[in-house]
Amino acid sequence: MSVPIIVTATFGDGDNGWLQELRRAHYPPERNQVPAHLTLFRQLPPSLEGELATRLARAAAAPPPRATIAGIMDLGEGTALRVESEDLEAIRAELAAAFHGLLTPQDRTWGPHVTIQNKVTPRIARTLQQQLRAGFEPRPLAIRALAAWRYLGGAWAPIRSWPFRR
């Protein structure tokens, strides 16, 4: 059985703590099995692990990407924080071009976000979105590293993390 690889960006300590707290407060506990993250790819074939590691290490040799939490996203049955980052878009585009023929339909496009609530009723999701929009102002988001994970049917097992050069 092949276990897909997930690629994410992880956050600096301050932002990570804030995002984890939002997830603890609003994500159904039985579904909150992974840390706060920004997914770059959801399902890469495990056969890419070696080449992926080389490419992620090369990308992480640069300074951390600039990113901004730019808005609130309605996921229907959940809520996310929309992220804007030309730097992350460039990293992802290079990886997507390298693995083009191996991407799932879901991985062919990208809408960067951090999910803070999922699998709730649309009414509960809309209530949180209204609360978050009331005091929302765009803010910088510190990106610490790129990471690869094995998908285990809910939980994820870390493969490795590549911190950006400081």
Feature map (PLM): residue ranges:
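Histidine-dependent nucleotide/RNA phosphoesterase domain, centered on the 2H-phosphoesterase fold
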Residues: 1-166
